[in-house]
Amino acid sequence: MEEQVFASKKVGVLPARWGSVRFTGKPLANILGKSLIQRTYENISQSTTLDKVVVATDNQRIMDHVLDFGGDCVMTSPECANGTERTAEAISRYFPEAEIIVNIQGDEPCLQHTVVDTLVRKLEESPEIQVVTPAAKTTDSHEILTNQKVKCVFDKNGKALYFSRSPIPHILKKETPIYLHIGVYAFRRNALFSYIESTPTSLSQAEDLEQLRILEHGGSIHICVVEAKSPSVDYPEDINKVEKYLTCHSSASF
């Protein structure tokens, strides 16, 4: 059977796998009556800049669920090492005309579509930028100190200098701002496949942060500072935090 292909130019991809080490079956976890992946999908589908939003999975249960709630879903290989590889495979197989690709982690059920729109517009307005990702300021000591939250530093023009699970920069003055990285990336097509073709690097492996691979190979990532900062789901116990957040923000478009 011939695979369906789409003519979309600007595509949001939600990579979703079943076999997460930290939380098996996470995409289908129930959050106040809807699955994690459905909440993420419905939020991003409100985007005013994307032509198509699609879930990319390696699991039939996830695909069936997405199709049941009316979403678009494509099947990818179980051999993909990370979400970016899964995104690239989905684009290569199903979206031959895609020019701007947004890789949106499927564990961000509270992510507002306006964050995605900010990234897409940045690429549209700035032809010299190849990859763009958001960050939000934080003063929360737990977020700063935990290695589960990624921090970033960037120059005065927004060019990323480094990403780390450690607190960066080192704080000698209380007024020094700390920025949390939000795990969403907007790529130009060539930049996405350049990443896929590049070799793993020492810092990306040491920090377990795939974006460092781009920097270590001499590429650049632009940072867009956004106001929106919301909880993600990494472990089963994070579900309760997300439900509390959604309850407190019930007037928002969730």
Swiss-Prot record:
Name the Enzyme Commission number(s) assigned to this protein.
Answer: 2.7.7.38
Q: Which reaction does it catalyse?
A: 3-deoxy-alpha-D-manno-oct-2-ulosonate + CTP = CMP-3-deoxy-beta-D-manno-octulosonate + diphosphate
> Record keywords: Transferase included?
yes
User: What is this enzyme's class at the first EC digit?
Assistant: transferase
Transferase listed as a keyword? yes
Listed GO biological process terms? CMP-keto-3-deoxy-D-manno-octulosonic acid biosynthetic process; lipopolysaccharide biosynthetic process
**InterPro entries in alphabetical order:** Cytidylyl_trans, KdsB, Nucleotide-diphossugar_trans
One example of the protein's molecular function in GO is:
3-deoxy-manno-octulosonate cytidylyltransferase activity
Which Gene Ontology terms of cellular component type are present? cytosol
Q: What pathway is it annotated to?
A: Nucleotide-sugar biosynthesis; CMP-3-deoxy-D-manno-octulosonate biosynthesis; CMP-3-deoxy-D-manno-octulosonate from 3-deoxy-D-manno-octulosonate and CTP: step 1/1; Bacterial outer membrane biogenesis; lipopolysaccharide biosynthesis
Swiss-Prot/TrEMBL keywords: Cytoplasm, Lipopolysaccharide biosynthesis, Nucleotidyltransferase, Transferase
Subcellular localization is given as:
Cytoplasm
Stored PANTHER family: 3-DEOXY-MANNO-OCTULOSONATE CYTIDYLYLTRANSFERASE (PTHR42866), 3-DEOXY-MANNO-OCTULOSONATE CYTIDYLYLTRANSFERASE, MITOCHONDRIAL (PTHR42866:SF2)
Q: What does this protein do?
A: Activates KDO (a required 8-carbon sugar) for incorporation into bacterial lipopolysaccharide in Gram-negative bacteria.
List the HAMAP family: KdsB (MF_00057)
**Of which family is this protein a member?**
Belongs to the KdsB family.
Put simply, this protein is called: 3-deoxy-manno-octulosonate cytidylyltransferase
Report the source organism.
Chlamydia felis (strain Fe/C-56) (Chlamydophila felis)
Organism lineage string: Bacteria, Pseudomonadati, Chlamydiota, Chlamydiia, Chlamydiales
Give the gene that encodes this protein: kdsB
